[in-house]
Amino acid sequence: ITIYTLAYAASIPVMGKLADRYGRKPIYLLSIALFGIGSLLCGLSQDVGSFEMLIIARAIQAIGGGGILPIATAEFGTSVPPEKRGMALGLVGGVYGVANIFGSSAGSLILNIFGSHNWQYIFYVNVPISVGIIVCGLIFLPNHKVEQVAKIDLLGITLLVAMILSLLYGVRNIDFFDLQA
């Protein structure tokens, strides 16, 4: 389990709740900004030679990433007519799957072009993409009126995040082949 996986899994429900409370557009744009800033800091960590900075930057990147898919999915779920909703949500899932495959391939290509000692470019490529998405989002994403939602349950969110992190850590570290009856 990496810091990215832990922060990503923990941030998904938090970002979803924040989007319900403050609106999808601002939290989606915040998520993209955090992802872009985290990516920039990941690249800079190579330049300053700081492994600690890389770990913190990956966590920032993951927190931003944790808001992107659920908020986009929720937006498609409410803005698309019910008869086309299945197709739209399938498209979102398909794009996300292709993006994961393309991202890995693009990262390999970048390493082949610039050399493995210049791995920071894998992260730098996300920065202009994030800026472009933010600009397009500011222009094209609708501003939905936020309905009155109950206050954010900080204790509940804290317990949920702790449970998710514990579960991920436990599943990752259990030795299934050495279980005693």
How does the language model describe each region?
Residues 2, 72, 137, 166-170:
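Hydrophobic/aromatic residues in alpha-helical transmembrane segments
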Residues 15, 103, 164:
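ATP/adenylate-binding site constellation spanning eukaryotic-like Ser/Thr protein kinases
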Residues 1-2, 97:
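Short, contiguous strand/loop micro-motifs
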Residues 5, 11, 130-133, 160-163:
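Alpha-helical transmembrane segments of integral membrane proteins
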Residues 2-16, 69-73:
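Central cavity-lining transmembrane alpha-helices of secondary-active solute carriers
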Residues 145-146, 161-181:
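Phenylalanine-glycine-rich, low-complexity intrinsically disordered regions
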Residues 19-155:
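Helix-loop-helix hairpins in multi-pass membrane proteins, especially solute transporters
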